[in-house]
C-alpha cells in the first residue's frame, strides 16, 4: 500500500514543497499503540553507514542502539518543515518521560542529502534538538540500500535551474524494538502525546 506521508522539501530557492510516497505494505493500526503496524516485521538493516564523527555505524551492533528502542527517520538538515518538526516532537516526547525510559530509547537521523549534509553539519543541526540524537550519512547507494531495507521511499536530491534543491523523503519514523525488529511506524500527524504514550511500551517490548 502506498501512503502519501512526506514532502518534497525545497531549499535554496522558494522552499516549495509537495507530496512524497512511502510504501507501508498492509499497514494498519497496531493493537495497544498509536502507531501503525507494519505488514511484516522488519529487521535492522545490515548496511553500515557513517556517523557524524566519520566512524562506521552498524545499527544492529553499535552499543548506542543495540538492545534499545531505535527510532529511524530519513531527512535532511535544510528541510524547512517536516524534518525539524519531527525531531522537535521526538525530543519533546522523550523529555516527558522518566530518565530510565529515555535511556532505553535512541533517535537516529539518516541524511538523504549526503552531498550537503556532512558529519559536522548534521551534528550541529541535531544538537539543536537533543545532543543524544544519532546522525548518519554515507554514499547515496548505501543510504538508498538502508532505506530500501525499511521499505521507506527516498529520492536523490535534485538541483533545479533556479538553484533550489529538492529532496523527496518520507515522513515515516520506523520504530525498532529492543530485539532489533520493527513492527510499528509513525506517520505524518503523530503527536508528541502519541510518541510519549508508545515509547515506554516499545521499551518494555509490549508491542
Language-model region placement:
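Generic structural signal for well-ordered beta-strand positions
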Residues: 57-58, 183
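Short loop/turn microsegments at loop-to-beta-strand junctions
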Residues: 44-45, 70, 170-172
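Structural microenvironment flanking redox-active thiols in thiol-disulfide oxidoreductases
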Residues: 85-146
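Short, ordered coil/turn segments that flank beta-strands lining enzyme active or ligand-binding pockets
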Residues: 52-53, 178
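Short active-site neighborhood of thiol/selenol oxidoreductases, capturing the structured segment around
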Residues: 60-90
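N-terminal targeting signals for export/organelle localization
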Residues: 1-50, 206-207
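Thiol/disulfide oxidoreductase modules built on the thioredoxin-like
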Residues: 142-198
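Second-shell loop/turn segments in exported
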Residues: 76-80, 110-112, 132-133, 184
Amino acid at each position: 500500500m502506498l501512503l502519501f506521508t512526506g514532502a518534497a522539501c525545497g531549499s535554496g530557492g522558494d522552499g516549495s514543497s509537495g507530496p512524497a510516497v512511502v510504501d507501508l505494505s498492509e499497514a494498519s493500526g497496531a493493537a495497544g499503540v498509536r502507531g501503525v503496524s507494519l505488514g511484516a516485521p522488519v529487521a535492522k538493516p545490515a548496511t553500515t553507514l557513517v556517523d557524524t564523527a566519520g566512524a562506521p555505524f552498524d545499527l544492529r551492533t553499535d552499543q548506542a542502539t543495540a538492545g534499545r528502542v531505535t527510532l529511524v527517520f530519513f531527512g535532511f538538515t535544510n528541510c524547512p518543515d517536516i524534518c525539524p518538526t519531527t525531531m522537535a516532537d521526538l525530543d519533546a516526547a522523550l523529555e516527558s518521560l522518566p530518565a530510565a525510559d529515555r535511556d532505553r530509547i535512541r533517535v537516529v537521523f539518516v541524511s538523504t542529502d549526503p552531498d550537503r549534509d556532512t558529519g559536522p553539519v548534521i551534528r550541529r543541526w541535531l544538537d539543536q534538538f537533543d545532543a543524544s540524537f544519532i546522525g548518519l550519512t554515507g554514499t547515496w547507494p548505501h543510504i538508498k540500500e538502508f532505506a530500501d531495507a525499511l521499505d521507506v521511499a527516498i529520492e536523490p536530491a535534485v538541483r533545479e535551474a533556479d538553484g533550489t534543491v529538492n529532496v523527496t523523503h518520507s515522513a515515516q519514523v520506523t520504530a525498532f524494538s529492543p530485539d532489533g525488529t520493527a513492527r510499528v511506524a509513525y506517520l505524518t500527524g503523530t503527536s508528541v502525546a502519541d510518541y510519549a504514550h508508545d515509547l515506554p511500551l516499545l521499551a518494555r517490548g509490549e508491542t
